[in-house]
Swiss-Prot record:
CDD domains: IHF_A. Belongs to the bacterial histone-like protein family. The gene is ihfA. GO terms for molecular function: DNA binding; structural constituent of chromatin. It comes from the Bacteria. This is Integration host factor subunit alpha. It comes from Nitrosomonas europaea (strain ATCC 19718 / CIP 103999 / KCTC 2705 / NBRC 14298). One of its GO terms (cellular component) is cytosol. Residues 49-70 are annotated as: Disordered.
Amino acid sequence: MALTKAELTDLLFENIGLNKREAKEIVECFYEEMRAALQNGDGVKLSGFGNFQLRTKPQRPGRNPKTGEEIPISARRVVTFHASQKLKSMVEANYRGESGTN
């Protein structure tokens, strides 16, 4: 199960005591700032969590699976995420049944 924006908003409401409108605005602002940074070609670094970066993929040959015809796949930019070592350690500790708190 994935954590959604609506669930994140509810968690801010429940745990911090913000009203629902304020919690929703904070979540939306956070997402918008991340989107804007990535659209401008900047990376997003969240300490202890990970990094979002843009990677440029060059044009490459592809193949239509139905016809077998070779077609070009356009160059594009993709967003990549690299988890921090701290996040990786916490996930691994949770998987092994350890406390995961460092």
